[in-house]
Curated annotation (Swiss-Prot):
Alphabetical keyword list: Chaperone, Cytoplasm
Main location: cytoplasm
Name of the protein in its database record: Prefoldin subunit alpha
Function, as annotated: Molecular chaperone capable of stabilizing a range of proteins. Seems to fulfill an ATP-independent, HSP70-like function in archaeal de novo protein folding.
Entry's localization field: Cytoplasm
Species this protein is from: Pyrobaculum calidifontis (strain DSM 21063 / JCM 11548 / VA1)
Gene Ontology MF terms in the entry: unfolded protein binding
Annotated family: Belongs to the prefoldin subunit alpha family.
Source species taxonomy: Archaea, Thermoproteota, Thermoprotei, Thermoproteales, Thermoproteaceae
Length: 134
């Protein structure tokens, strides 16, 4: 394999750029994964509130639960951009479900991009290793 000095320099630059981009995408993926998990928990909570009767244990954070009978049929729901509104359980469920679907798509897209960039970085690394540069 005969590569010019410029070709090698471009490969090194692309390899570094890919690694930087991968680090950024992996951080985004971690954030989106947390949001998906949080939305799944919220959706389960709204569905639990929709079911009738009895005392409930509700997670309030840090592994702490509070018990009680919940008679309210509305929940304070984030609408985006820092705005909240009291919504009936049906609409709250719909909004949380839509957000969960959106973030799940973003997560899948990030995973696909990470996979493609990882493959390209591996190809470049193999070329650089054959040239004795990595």
């Amino acid at each position: 394999m005969s590569l010019s000095r410029q070709d090698i320099q471009r490969l090194l630059e692309e390899y570094q750029l890919l690694n930087d981009l991968l680090a950024s995408l992996q951080a985004q993926h971690a954030t989106v994964s947390e949001l998906v998990e949080e939305l799944s928990t919220a959706l389960d909570g709204v569905r639990l509130l929709k079911s009738e009767g009895g005392e409930r244990l509700v997670h309030i954070g840090a592994g702490i639960f509070v018990g009680g009978v919940f008679e309210g049929r509305e929940v304070l729901t984030p609408l985006g951009a820092g705005y909240y509104a009291f919504l009936d359980l049906e609409n709250a469920e719909r909004i949380v479900k839509e957000r969960l679907e959106e973030y799940s798509k973003v997560k899948t897209s990030l995973e696909e991009n990470i996979e493609k960039l990882t493959e390209r970085a591996l190809q470049i690394r193999q070329v650089l290793e054959r040239l004795g540069l990595r």
